[in-house]
């Protein structure tokens, strides 16, 4: 922390924090440091990754906890944990070697865009793949923590399995 402070002290002395955060110009060679594009880019990547990941994880957690046999969950849990243990550098390398060329070769031309593939979309897709194991584990544990009596009560009152999931399980979980 001390080294970081020493290296950035001149920057903090010459510019206000407001100017650093909200300036759109990034030219380090000429002494212009604007963090705004990086902040906005990070927000976009995060929002898109959550948009991609949320439905996949929610539907997978519902399927695994409500429709499949317990053996499927016992097999899937270690696999999900292994995916969660993969270093982010490996995911990033996979993104550069697979996702970026895919976007450049197929998605760009599909939409009439000439691109190298290095984009917010590529970053969001890689981030969404990275966070799937964590969100999926959380949702599975939430659904498993709901008392079985609630599900059985809804089913005994004549609700279908989907009605039970929609009206009881999801409302209790979320």
Task: Describe the role of every protein-language-model region.
Residues 1-7, 81-92:
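Hydrophobic alpha-helical membrane-insertion segments
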Residues 6, 13-33, 92-129:
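Membrane-interfacial helix termini and adjacent extracytoplasmic/periplasmic loops
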Residues 31-49:
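Individual transmembrane alpha-helix segments
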Residues 49-80:
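Transmembrane-helix boundary motif in ABC transporter permease subunits
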Residues 56, 68-71, 138-152, 161-163:
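Transmembrane helix boundary and interhelical loop/hinge segments in multi-pass membrane proteins
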Residues 78, 82, 135-139, 146, ...:
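Transmembrane alpha-helices
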Residues 79-86, 99, 125-135:
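Hydrophobic transmembrane alpha-helices
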Residues 87, 157-158:
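Glycine/proline-centered hinge or cleavage motifs at structural transition points of membrane proteins
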């Amino acid at each position: 922390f001390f080294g970081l402070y020493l290296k950035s002290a001149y920057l903090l002395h010459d510019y206000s924090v407001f100017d650093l955060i909200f300036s759109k110009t990034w030219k380090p060679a000429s002494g212009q440091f604007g963090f705004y594009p990086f902040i906005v880019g990070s927000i976009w990547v995060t929002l898109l990754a959550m948009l991609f990941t949320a439905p996949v994880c929610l539907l997978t957690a519902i399927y695994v906890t409500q429709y499949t046999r317990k053996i499927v969950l016992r097999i899937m849990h270690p696999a999900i944990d292994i995916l969660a243990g993969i270093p982010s550098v490996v995911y990033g390398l996979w993104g550069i070697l697979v996702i970026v060329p895919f976007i450049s070769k197929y998605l760009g031309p599909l939409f009439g865009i000439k691109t190298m593939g290095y984009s917010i979309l590529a970053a969001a897709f890689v981030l969404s793949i990275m966070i799937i194991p964590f969100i999926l584990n959380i949702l599975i544990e939430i659904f498993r923590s709901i008392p079985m009596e609630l599900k059985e009560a809804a089913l005994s009152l004549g609700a279908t399995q989907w009605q039970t999931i929609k009206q009881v399980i999801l409302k209790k979980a979320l």
